[in-house]
Amino acid sequence: MSQLTDGFGRSFPYLRLSLTEACNFRCSYCLPDGYQADGRPRFLQVDEIARLVRAFAALGMSKIRLTGGEPSLRKDLDEIIATVAAVPGIRKVAITTNGTLLPRRLPGWHRAGLTALNVSMDSLQRERFKTITGHDRLPEIEQGLALAQALGLPAIKLNAVLLRGLNDDELPQWMDYLRGRPFSVRFIELMRTGDNEAYFQRHHLRADVVIEQLLAAGWHERPRAADAGPAREFGHPDHRGSIGIIAPYSRDFCKGCNRLRVTAKGDLRLCLFGEFGVPLRPLLQRDEDHDALLARITTQLGLKAAGHGLHQGQTGLTPHLASIGG
């Protein structure tokens, strides 16, 4: 099956689908004042999600990542996962979560067809974690990760946003943590959004600083697979785990773009920091609109730019990452 390809030769096997803008954390870099609902939002329903995923699968997509906000706040998440996993052509169903509900809900997600797990974990130190996220929930997350291992989930990744002055001295602790754990930790460079300019100026840390420390500690960059995304992967012979660096301010970051995004309200976003969204929801109400939906997606892909405008301070439509799921 052919894959979606843009005018710059990039293929897109991967969709990030936001299920909600709501979040139960108050992360200092994203929603420091907590989630503020705009009226009564109506996020995509299961039948709309089914039509959406069938369309992207028909266009060659094989991986769906469910994001938020915090997707575990959806009470119908088990049904959503099962619906996505049942679509022919979808081989990988992943979720990105803050992990607080893993002990209670992960078994149900696993039974429904979840194949990969990403957990946001910005610090290994309990007090720091509380400072960054606004919640003292690190023990539940650690319990959930142990459960994920026990269930045999084949892909477990941890996401940590690099924050100068808050967690930038924890790399040695992370290395020790990965010595006996087969996780992949992703260090993500803080990105400027529409509402965090002052915070960005205080806490942005160049990913190069971490890469230099990794190389000095004997870690080696792994060859990039042909279908790899923008992360640079590092490994060490004495560690079971690996480290990925996601550096959106690096020169070649956008060359490795392999994903599209759909918001919780059904807008196609060609770039995390794009200037416009394409409404797909009107074509998600009837099965008979399947061909029109395919045409809208493929036509709009031709408008995808070569790269973002972060270096010029252009953050596009993204007020904060909870609005689109990163």
Swiss-Prot record:
[4Fe-4S] cluster 1 binds at C23, C27, C30. Catalyzes the cyclization of GTP to (8S)-3',8-cyclo-7,8-dihydroguanosine 5'-triphosphate. Keywords: 4Fe-4S, GTP-binding, Iron, Iron-sulfur, Lyase, Metal-binding, Molybdenum cofactor biosynthesis, Nucleotide-binding, S-adenosyl-L-methionine. It comes from Stenotrophomonas maltophilia (strain K279a). GTP binds at R16, R65, T96, K157, R259, L260, R261. Pathway: Cofactor biosynthesis; molybdopterin biosynthesis. Monomer and homodimer. Its cofactor is [4Fe-4S] cluster. CDD domains: Radical_SAM, Twitch_MoaA. Belongs to the radical SAM superfamily. MoaA family. Pfam families: Mob_synth_C, Radical_SAM. This is GTP 3',8-cyclase. The keyword Secreted does not apply. PANTHER family: GTP 3',8-CYCLASE, MOLYBDOPTERIN COFACTOR SYNTHESIS PROTEIN A. GO terms for biological process: Mo-molybdopterin cofactor biosynthetic process. Binds 2 [4Fe-4S] clusters. Binds 1 [4Fe-4S] cluster coordinated with 3 cysteines and an exchangeable S-adenosyl-L-methionine and 1 [4Fe-4S] cluster coordinated with 3 cysteines and the GTP-derived substrate. Its EC number is 4.1.99.22. Residues 7-232 form the Radical SAM core domain. GO terms for molecular function: 4 iron, 4 sulfur cluster binding; cyclic pyranopterin monophosphate synthase activity; GTP 3',8'-cyclase activity; GTP binding; metal ion binding; S-adenosyl-L-methionine binding. The gene is moaA.
